[in-house]
């Protein structure tokens, strides 16, 4: 059995990656490369991964898919910054029954999310699984996950040991 016999459209996958390469010429390999940041005495890398879960249902209702890409980046980056790390880069994972324009819309959001977070998208994976999931009429079969890495000076890690009753909590919102 080959890819075509299993229902995987290699040409659609290659076209999808080509569209992404127009915006990100460095992607497309089997890994993402990122230079080690300078200016740290004892740098610690911090990583976080997350998925969008049932938020996909909101996209289905409104037929708007770019916002879920922004949200995916934000959730991963938010996990990384909780310890004081500066986010550096992001990788995405899309699993779907069929590569469709929905995937392009999601990636537009991922790119926007990376721009808003001030980080680079250095790679990812788009997996087409036609025998395991129906085509994405409304994205029913789409699963999204992301992974982000940041860096923090070892002596500046926020780990909660110094949080005390009465401390002020600040909340910021970007409008």
Predicted regions and their residues:
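N-terminal amphipathic/basic leader segments beginning at the initiator methionine
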Residues: 1-26
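Short, structured beta-strand/loop micro-motifs enriched in basic residues and often containing a Trp
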Residues: 147-154
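N-terminal small/glycine-rich loop or linker at the start of catalytic domains
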Residues: 42-62
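A glycine-rich phosphate/pyrophosphate-binding beta-strand-loop-alpha-helix module
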Residues: 63-143
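Conserved small/polar residues in nucleotide/adenosyl-binding loops
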Residues: 173-175
């Amino acid at each position: 059995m080959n890819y075509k016999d299993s229902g995987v459209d290699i040409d659609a996958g290659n076209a999808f990656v080509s569209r992404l390469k127009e915006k990100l010429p460095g992607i497309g390999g089997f890994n993402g490369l990122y230079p080690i940041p300078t200016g740290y005495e004892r740098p610690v890398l911090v990583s976080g991964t997350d998925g969008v879960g049932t938020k996909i249902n909101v996209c289905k209702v409104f037929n708007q898919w770019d916002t879920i890409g922004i949200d995916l980046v934000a959730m991963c980056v938010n996990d990384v910054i909780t310890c004081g790390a500066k986010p550096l880069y992001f990788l995405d994972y899309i699993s779907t029954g069929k590569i469709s324009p929905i995937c392009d819309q999601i990636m537009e959001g991922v790119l926007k999310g990376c721009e808003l977070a001030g980080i680079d998208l250095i790679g990812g994976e788009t997996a087409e699984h036609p025998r395991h999931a129906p085509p994405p009429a409304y994205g029913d079969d789409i699963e999204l996950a992301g992974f982000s890495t940041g860096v923090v000076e070892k002596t500046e890690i926020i780990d909660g040991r110094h949080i005390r009753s009465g401390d002020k909590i600040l909340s910021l919102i970007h409008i």
